[in-house]
């Protein structure tokens, strides 16, 4: 069995969660010995689409079984780019077009599975399978932590809270900014960027007025970001809507306490005080971060790590293998 892992605009994916998911798919297939290609001109037995127009999918379906990866929903498109309200009806139609013609759909969580199955055009099976996490990549390495603290010139005992994501209102960066304002003795760092044209006026204004204890370095990769996850005192992810939240998996894999917004996607696999700390507003977020900074969270951290062990690259590879075998049977 050989798979075409297909995505248009591959060069643009690197800085996004979809880009990391695409990379994880490659690693997962390698882990279970499934041959793949990213070249549509190559030979293969089935197609696993991440990003494509419906016309491209229809073309693939004439010859091959096609899996469409359900990275996006109408819900997680809201409050993202500037002019999202104008684009939303067209985006919804796009989702209908691609999900409605898939032979099988893979999506990261039972929550996103429910949302996709609720679309009246979806007739194919929908499989919930995590985007996965490379546990080895987020293992604690002192040299990464040193690179992180040196990069930002942090004092040895300086408390640090990090957030990661594109500069969408949906990601809750404005709340990250306001929580930072209430904790002037803690350094808050948000990793991620977005072009000014795509950033909403609301977010640009909040960023312009961010407090002095908040740093925004833009997109950072390599040792510095790995060191940030391992070396921070807390990962704070106040997103309003996710299909999974790879940042959350990265925080748990790094064995760093995670504070996040209590939203539906986490309801059935991340529990408050057992794996993470969940809040509903900035007042609660501030209190929870203070709790992380001053109380031992060892038990919660270990419980959280068990969650990502179940979403390791190897286990995702086995899940993909099963999905591929299923779609081949469907197409026969």
Swiss-Prot record:
Which Gene3D superfamilies does the record match to this protein?
Answer: Glycogen Phosphorylase B
Localization (cell): Cell membrane
Q: Which UniProt keywords apply?
A: Carbohydrate metabolism, Cell membrane, Glycerol metabolism, Glycosyltransferase, Lipid biosynthesis, Lipid metabolism, Magnesium, Membrane, Transferase
| Pfam families documented for this protein | Glyco_transf_4, Glycos_transf_1
Regulation of catalytic or functional activity: Activated by the negatively charged lipids phosphatidylglycerol (PG), cardiolipin (CL), nonbilayer-prone 1,3-DAG, 1,2-dioleoylphosphatidylglycerol (DOPG) and 1,2-dioleoylphosphatidylserine (DOPS). Inhibited by 1,2-diacyl-3-O-(alpha-D-galactopyranosyl)-sn-glycerol, 1,2-diacyl-3-O-[6-O-acyl(alpha-D-glucopyranosyl)]-sn-glycerol and 1,2-diacyl-3-O-[alpha-D-glucopyranosyl-(1->2)-O-(6-O-acyl-alpha-D-glucopyranosyl)]-sn-glycerol.
**What are the EC numbers?**
2.4.1.208, 2.4.1.337
Enumerate the catalysed reactions. a 1,2-diacyl-sn-glycerol + UDP-alpha-D-glucose = a 1,2-diacyl-3-O-(alpha-D-glucopyranosyl)-sn-glycerol + UDP + H(+); a 1,2-diacyl-3-O-(alpha-D-glucopyranosyl)-sn-glycerol + UDP-alpha-D-glucose = a 1,2-diacyl-3-O-[alpha-D-glucosyl-(1-> 2)-alpha-D-glucosyl]-sn-glycerol + UDP + H(+)
One cellular component term from this protein's GO annotations in UniProt:
plasma membrane
Which CDD domains does this chain map to?
GT4_PimA-like
Q: Which GO terms describe its biological process?
A: enterobacterial common antigen biosynthetic process; glycerol metabolic process; membrane lipid biosynthetic process
- Which family does the record assign? Belongs to the glycosyltransferase group 1 family. Glycosyltransferase 4 subfamily.
What protein name is recorded for this chain? Answer: Processive diacylglycerol alpha-glucosyltransferase
Q: Which organism is it from?
A: Acholeplasma laidlawii
The organism's lineage is: Bacteria, Bacillati, Mycoplasmatota, Mollicutes, Acholeplasmatales
Q: Which gene encodes it?
A: dgs
């Amino acid at each position: 069995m050989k798979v075409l892992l297909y995505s248009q605009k591959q060069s643009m994916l690197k800085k996004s969660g979809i880009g990391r998911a695409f990379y994880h798919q490659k690693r997962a297939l390698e882990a279970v010995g499934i041959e793949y290609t990213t070249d549509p001109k190559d030979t293969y037995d089935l197609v696993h689409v991440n990003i494509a127009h419906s016309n491209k999918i229809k073309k693939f379906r004439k010859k091959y079984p096609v899996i469409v990866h359900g990275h996006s929903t109408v819900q997680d498109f809201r409050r993202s780019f500037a002019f999202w309200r104008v684009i939303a009806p067209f985006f919804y139609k796009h989702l209908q077009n691609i999900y409605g013609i898939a032979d099988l759909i893979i999506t990261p969580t039972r929550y996103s599975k429910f949302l996709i199955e609720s679309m009246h055009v979806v007739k194919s099976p929908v499989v919930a399978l995590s985007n996965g996490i490379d546990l080895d990549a987020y293992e604690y390495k002192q040299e990464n932590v040193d690179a992180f603290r040196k990069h930002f010139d942090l004092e040895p005992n300086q408390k640090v809270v990090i957030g990661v994501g594109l500069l969408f209102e949906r990601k809750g960066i404005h709340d990250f900014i306001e929580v930072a304002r209430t904790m002037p003795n803690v350094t808050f760092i948000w990793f991620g960027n977005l072009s000014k044209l795509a950033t909403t006026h609301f977010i640009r204004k909040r960023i312009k007025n961010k407090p002095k204890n908040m740093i925004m370095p833009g997109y950072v990769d390599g040792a510095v970001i790995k060191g940030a996850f391992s070396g921070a005192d807390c990962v704070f992810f106040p997103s309003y809507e996710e299909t999974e939240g790879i940042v959350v998996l990265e925080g748990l894999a790094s064995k760093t306490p995670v504070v996040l917004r209590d939203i539906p996607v986490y309801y059935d696999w991340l529990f408050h005080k057992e794996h993470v700390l969940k809040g509903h507003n900035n007042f609660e977020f501030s209190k929870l971060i203070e709790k992380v900074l001053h109380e031992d969270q060892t038990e919660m951290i270990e419980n959280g790590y068990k969650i990502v062990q179940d979403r390791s690259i190897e286990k995702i590879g086995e899940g993909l293998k099963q999905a591929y075998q299923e779609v081949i049977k469907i197409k026969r």
